[in-house]
Structure formats: structure tokens, C-alpha cells
């Protein structure tokens, strides 16, 4: 509701400071060394007060309040998460999307909160390097249609093709939830579905 989220630990704070995100406030444990060149308000807090604010059991003595970014234009390579509920999974997929240089990640259908502290930690800083947004399914479909980006799903059906045979020069690839896979609503909008061929012994 505030339009802000909390990140914890020196690495995440430094990633936030180096990014295009606006860092509203830095919270630091009394006696801790501060990063150089801070221009935003900095509050020194007793260790027990900072620990109460943070999500981790053993905070690293520094945290930051960061403003969420407004949505930018859609890129050519998009990952869609459809109902992925575990914050660690959402964060890991965002980190993987960053490793593959994807343009953005869109979350639909009650995914884990993008700005949950567990999600943010699992991204290992990728949340500050990749565009990532929670949107409604209708908003996603509208964005893809306006941008001319086809939607592909990771599921098995009659038109499923091996990943290596798909033209992904311009594409959004949807990944379903841990328990049920892709929702029918998203599956119905997929131009094709993709599979990764596996060794029969697997």
C-alpha cells in the first residue's frame, strides 16, 4: 500500500543503491559502517530495534526502504509466472531470468508477493536489474497483444514442440504453479506449448 518494500543485508542494499530504484531510507545498526555517498535519510537503530523491523532472524546490520518502480515498456523476452506460490521459487526464477538476460518477469494469478523479503533475498539482487511486475491476467494479455509478443506455455498438449525448435526471438514463456501447472486461462491464450526433451530413464 505504501508503494515501498524493505531489503536487508549489505549486498541487497548496495544493489538497490546502484540501481534505477529510488532508495527512500537506509536503516543501520548503531556502530555499523555506512556505504559511501548516501544522500537519503539514514537512521541508526539499536540492534534489537533493527532486528524487529527485519524479516531475517540474523539481520546483517543494514536495511533499506525502496520505492517500487512503475511499469515500463514490454521487451522482447518475457517470463510469465502463473500462480507460482513459493517466494523462494519466484526469486530463483527471477534470478535465472536475469542470468539469461530476459527483459522482464510478469506475475499473475496469486503468485508469491514479488516484494516479500524472502522473494527479494532469493533474487540475489536480480530484482533491481530486471523489470518485474505483478499484474492481472487481463493486463498481461493486453500488454502482449499491443506489443505483438506471442505467449508460449510450458505444458503438454497436441501442439507441444521441443524448446530447441521454438522461435523465441520475440516471446513470452509462461511457467505454471508448483502444484497444478499453468491455469486454463493462461493455457488458452498460448500460441504453442513447449517441452524440454528428457532422457527416457528420468
Language-model features: where?
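Acidic/glycine-rich phosphate/pyrophosphate-binding loops and surrounding catalytic core
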Residues: 57-62, 66-73
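N-terminal positively charged helical leader segments and presequences
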Residues: 1-55
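Active-site/ligand-binding-proximal alpha/beta "capping" segment
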Residues: 152-202
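Short loop/helix-cap segments at secondary-structure boundaries that form the rim of catalytic
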Residues: 33-40, 71-74, 184-188
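Short, polar loop motifs at secondary-structure junctions
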Residues: 10, 28-34, 68-69, 156-158, ...
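RNA substrate-binding interface of SAM-dependent RNA methyltransferases
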Residues: 18, 70, 74-159
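Short beta->alpha connector loops at strand-helix junctions that form conserved
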Residues: 45-46, 82, 108-109, 131, ...
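Structured adenosyl-cofactor binding patch, chiefly the S-adenosyl-L-methionine
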Residues: 64, 99-100, 111-114, 118-127, ...
Amino acid at each position: 500500500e505504501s508503494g515501498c518494500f524493505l531489503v536487508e543485508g549489505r549486498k541487497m542494499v548496495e544493489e538497490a543503491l546502484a540501481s534505477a530504484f529510488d532508495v527512500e531510507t537506509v536503516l543501520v545498526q548503531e556502530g555499523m559502517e555506512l556505504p559511501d555517498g548516501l544522500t537519503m535519510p539514514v537512521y541508526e537503530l539499536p540492534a534489537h530495534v533493527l532486528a524487529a523491523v527485519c524479516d531475517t532472524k540474523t539481520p546483517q546490520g543494514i536495511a533499506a526502504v525502496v520505492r517500487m518502480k512503475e511499469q515500463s515498456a514490454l521487451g522482447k523476452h518475457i517470463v510469465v509466472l502463473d500462480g507460482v506460490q513459493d517466494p523462494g521459487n519466484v526469486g530463483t526464477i527471477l534470478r535465472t531470468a536475469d542470468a539469461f538476460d530476459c527483459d522482464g518477469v510478469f506475475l499473475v494469478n496469486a503468485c508469491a508477493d514479488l516484494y516479500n523479503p524472502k522473494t527479494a533475498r532469493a533474487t540475489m539482487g536480480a530484482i533491481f536489474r530486471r523489470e518485474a511486475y505483478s499484474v492481472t491476467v487481463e493486463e498481461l494479455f493486453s500488454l502482449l497483444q499491443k506489443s505483438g509478443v506471442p505467449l508460449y506455455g510450458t505444458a503438454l498438449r497436441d501442439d507441444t514442440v521441443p524448446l530447441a525448435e521454438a522461435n523465441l526471438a520475440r516471446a513470452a514463456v509462461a511457467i505454471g504453479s508448483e502444484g497444478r501447472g499453468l491455469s486454463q486461462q493462461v493455457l488458452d491464450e498460448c500460441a504453442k506449448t513447449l517441452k524440454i526433451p528428457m532422457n527416457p530413464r528420468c
